[in-house]
């Protein structure tokens, strides 16, 4: 039987604080801690103090994430959280809490109810099907529209009109 009220016998390292943000000297490949997969409405978030994943919320509508999502260790955005990463064109589900190497292809400027909450756009660095993608623009016009639509409407049932995509950089 487990001793539920006993302190842990060892400390689990917090990946947010020990992993480097970049895996290479060219600063194009990032470590990304996976928080969720595409086609889910559940929003998981890393607890910054411990590095554990927590169900932050269940989506307010059936509008599911159109990409896998995670964060970059040792980074902090203006909203006080690690920098967010959209991992696009993932064909197989990733394991929540796992570390993947991703190649940066752009940034989406995002205003979430008055807070800056920009999103790094990336592809899995080892996915040979993505070798031809060097910029978010290579994903096509429909991808841009879908991503913009998702971010500008995912909170509509809770706080309509509070989220704005302010462009893409690449």
State where each predicted segment sits.
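Hydrophobic N-terminal alpha-helices or hydrophobic patches in metabolic proteins across all domains
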Residues: 1-170
């Amino acid at each position: 039987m487990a001793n539920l009220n006993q302190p842990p016998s060892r400390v689990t390292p917090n990946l947010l604080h020990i992993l480097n943000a970049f895996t290479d000297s060219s600063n194009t490949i990032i470590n990304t801690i996976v928080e969720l997969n595409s086609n889910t409405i559940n929003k998981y978030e890393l607890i910054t103090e411990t590095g554990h994943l927590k169900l932050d919320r269940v989506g307010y509508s059936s509008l599911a994430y159109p990409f896998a999502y995670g964060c970059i260790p040792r980074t902090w955005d203006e909203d006080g959280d690690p920098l967010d990463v959209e991992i696009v064109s993932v064909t197989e589900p990733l394991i929540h809490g796992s570390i993947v190497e991703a190649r940066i292809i752009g940034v989406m400027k995002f205003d979430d109810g008055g807070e800056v909450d920009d999103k790094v756009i990336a592809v899995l660095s080892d996915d040979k099907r993505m070798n031809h993608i060097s910029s978010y623009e290579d994903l096509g016009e429909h991808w841009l529209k879908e991503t913009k639509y998702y971010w500008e409407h995912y909170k509509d049932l809770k706080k309509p009109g509070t989220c704005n995509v302010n462009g893409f950089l690449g």
